[in-house]
A protein has these predicted regions:
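C-terminal charged capping/lid subdomain of soluble metabolic enzymes
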Residues: 90-168
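Active-site segments that bind and position negatively charged phosphate/pyrophosphate groups
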Residues: 1-107
Length: 168
């Protein structure tokens, strides 16, 4: 079901963004609402974008990205989750999904790196705050099939940066 949703988004999202009266927009919104709802409802917390929402929650700790919408932070969080799955879970399919998703998000004007979130000048200490919040006890992040520490999450966040490294 997740692959169907992904494929629908890869196919229809460019047209859907341009024309909210199009059939592509209707298919995209239905796919997001219905498929995500069914998956989350049937599979529970283990079938949701667990790291993506944890990343969103962590990013809320930084005023510099308060202007970024919830869905934009979650979209960025999906890229982070795929990076975690690739590096910590040794998942080559996650690497392929990352390579497919990143250019689509970028073409839609959605954030794909820290700079896009307004965090071009983020410090390592600020990122540590984000990661500790995202990794706190009870976080959905811990539903992943491998352990994610704040340091591992910070590596994934910084690894998505397209420009300069994080300041000390």
């Amino acid at each position: 079901m997740a692959r169907v949703l992904r494929d629908q988004l890869l196919i229809d999202s460019p047209v859907a963004i341009e024309d909210s009266a199009s059939a592509a927009w209707e298919r995209t919104t239905e796919a997001c609402g219905l498929t995500a709802g069914v998956m989350g409802g049937l599979g529970g917390a283990r079938c949701r974008t667990v790291a993506a929402h944890a990343v969103h929650n962590g990013l809320t700790q930084l005023p510099a990205c308060h202007h970024v919408l919830h869905g934009e932070k979650v979209g960025f969080g999906i890229l982070v989750q795929l990076r975690l799955e690739e590096h910590l879970g040794d998942n080559r399919l996650a690497a392929q999904a990352h390579r497919q998703l990143k250019p689509v998000l970028k073409s839609l004007g959605l954030p794909v790196c820290l700079d896009d979130l307004g965090l071009a000048n983020v410090t390592a200490s600020e990122l540590q705050t984000v990661c500790e919040f995202a990794c706190q006890d009870g976080s959905d992040l811990h539903h992943l099939p491998f352990k994610v520490t704040p340091d591992a999450l910070q590596d994934a966040l910084v690894g998505l940066s397209e420009r300069s490294p994080v300041r000390s």
